[in-house]
């Protein structure tokens, strides 16, 4: 199902943005971020997130993010934002003229957990696929929108039947850049059930 961005709802809209039936453009505001406590010992919760609400417990969300990031920590990608202390984000985050961080942050009960891999700084777009199976989530990325590779499998303890999912972009430092999101689509869950070892009995 193709997603009409006009049906999505902002949590903290940025000062500059544009929404059409085909795409979303976000111009980030300086000093916007999502992070809770771990290592840095600060709580940042002011990044704009544009999301769709669903009670569907098995689905995949696909989007292409294009970004003109240029200052450390500039980032754009996908998110499942439940509240300040419980959320998931996956993005490309600018580091310097040589590398960016392709990574994900999972925050449960007010503590964030970041995992990343370095990619070339010349990359200016990325496809993301976010899949849900109940309270479990899988994030994948792709450079062509066809062949996806796993970034992370995680759990959100506070994910009820109804959740919100979508896109975000932010600039934690003194920066602003444009991120354009296209090809927003919700599909049947592409993350198939595990077919190996049987689950433990609860």
Language model features by range: what are they?
Residues 1-202:
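Extracellular glycan-recognition regions
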């Amino acid at each position: 199902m193709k997603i009409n961005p006009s049906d999505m709802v902002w949590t903290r809209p940025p000062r500059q943005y544009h929404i059409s039936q085909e795409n979303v453009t976000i111009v980030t505001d300086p000093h916007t971020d999502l992070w809770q406590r771990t290592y840095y010992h600060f709580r940042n919760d002011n990044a704009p997130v544009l999301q769709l609400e669903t009670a569907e417990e098995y689905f995949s969300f696909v989007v292409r993010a294009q970004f003109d990031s240029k200052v450390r920590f500039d980032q754009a990608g996908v998110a499942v934002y439940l509240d300040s202390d419980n959320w998931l984000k996956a993005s490309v985050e600018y580091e310097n003229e040589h590398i960016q961080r392709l990574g994900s942050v999972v925050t449960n009960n007010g503590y964030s957990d970041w995992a990343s891999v370095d990619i070339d700084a010349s990359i200016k777009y990325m496809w993301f696929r976010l899949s849900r199976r109940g309270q479990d989530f899988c994030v994948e990325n792709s450079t062509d929108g066809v062949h996806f590779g796993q970034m992370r499998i995680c759990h959100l303890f506070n994910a009820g039947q109804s959740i919100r999912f979508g896109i975000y972009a932010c600039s934690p430092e003194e920066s602003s850049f444009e991120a354009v999101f296209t090809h927003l689509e919700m599909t049947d869950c592409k993350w198939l059930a595990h077919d190996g070892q049987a689950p433990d009995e609860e």
